[in-house]
């Protein structure tokens, strides 16, 4: 009878410990899931920010390259005009 009582008490304690363990494990899992979700949200926001910055830098680079191309064309045109003027001046001198 005493052994049965002790056995029953031990079994109840074990069940209680198992129940507490499952609750704590579930709590840890919930916190872990929240943390993972928060980190993913932060990462996605940072990634979006980087992508927007990259697009801005890409547009700036495109604008600079286009301006450089226009300046090169202007330089060629001015060089051609200069050469034509020099040729004209030589012809007048002759």
Swiss-Prot record:
This is Putative uncharacterized protein HP_0451. It comes from Helicobacter pylori (strain ATCC 700392 / 26695).
């Amino acid at each position: 009878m005493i052994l049965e009582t002790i056995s029953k008490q031990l079994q109840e304690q074990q069940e209680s410990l198992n129940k507490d363990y499952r609750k704590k494990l579930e709590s840890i899992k919930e916190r872990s899931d929240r943390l993972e979700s928060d980190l993913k949200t932060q990462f996605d926001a940072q990634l979006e920010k980087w992508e927007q910055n990259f697009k801005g830098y890409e547009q700036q680079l495109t604008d600079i390259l286009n301006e450089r191309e226009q300046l090169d064309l202007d330089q060629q045109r001015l060089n051609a005009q200069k050469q034509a003027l020099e040729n004209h001046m030589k012809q007048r001198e002759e």
